A protein has these predicted regions:
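Alpha-helical scaffold segments of alpha-solenoid architecture
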Residues: 33-37, 44, 53, 57, ...
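Helix-turn-helix repeat elements of alpha-solenoid scaffolds
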Residues: 6-18, 48-58, 92-98
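Active-site lining segments of carbohydrate-active enzymes
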Residues: 1-10, 14-24, 34, 38-41
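Short coil/turn linkers that connect adjacent helices within long alpha-helical scaffolds
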Residues: 5-7, 24-28, 45, 64-69, ...
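Residue position in alpha-helical solenoids
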Residues: 2, 15, 21-25, 58-65, ...
Length: 214
């Protein structure tokens, strides 16, 4: 866990493998769930997505055989959301992030905020910026609406609804520190920026029936 927090991902993997071998003889499903979840996060961090998915499946298998506390369930749902978003299945990812937000909120865990942020990100990636505002009027989400991490998503949704590359760039600049520290948001917004850029180019050339390239 400490190596993951310190971003020493490759050093963490052999230790996780060794720990899993020892835990399987003890048959402690709760700890197995935690370690497989950590394995999934570490593999995701080094972009080994097949192993990340396999580890998450193992974590869920272990969790399904015991009573899984809300906090652990929320962490599993968060990782599921992240992996579905990577696969561009933003609709399923948004559902997982909603479950995550509810789970963390039920135990007053601050990780409800990034869960909400990722759910809003999914709506933006689905080209549904208007849903960002309706979600933020909900009972749980409204508690976090003024948080700076959520303000980022509102600014991006606003830019997207206007198909404004200028507003999008302004939002990226205004919330630079929040965005640079979150690799998940940064990667998806980079793809969105490319899409907006393409839309803006198309909007410029739409009035012309014939274009001559120099």
């Amino acid at each position: 866990g400490q190596l993951y927090e310190a971003k020493a991902y490759r050093e963490a993997l052999p230790l996780i493998a060794q720990l899993l071998r020892e835990l399987k003889t003890l048959d402690d499903k709760m700890i197995l769930t935690e370690v497989h979840l950590l394995e999934s996060k570490v593999n995701h961090a080094i972009s080994n997505f097949p192993k990340s998915k396999a580890a998450l499946t193992s974590a869920r298998t272990s969790a399904n055989s015991i009573y899984c506390p809300p906090l652990m369930q929320a962490q599993l749902d968060m990782q599921s959301g992240v992996l579905h978003a990577d696969d561009k299945d933003f609709k399923t990812a948004a559902s997982y992030f909603y479950e995550t937000m509810e789970g963390f909120d039920s135990v007053d865990d601050a990780r409800a905020i990034p869960a909400l942020k990722y759910m809003l990100l999914c709506k933006i990636m689905l080209n549904q910026p208007e849903e960002v505002y309706s979600i933020l009027e909900g009972k749980i989400a409204s508690k976090y609406a003024k948080h700076r991490e959520i303000e980022v998503m509102k600014a991006v949704a606003e830019a997207q609804s206007h198909r404004s590359l200028e507003d999008f760039e302004r939002a990226l600049q205004q919330y630079k520190s929040e965005l640079s520290s979150d690799l998940i948001v940064r990667n998806h917004l980079s793809a969105l920026y490319d899409k907006l850029l393409e839309q803006n180019i198309l909007r410029v050339i739409e009035p012309y029936s014939r274009i001559e390239l120099a």
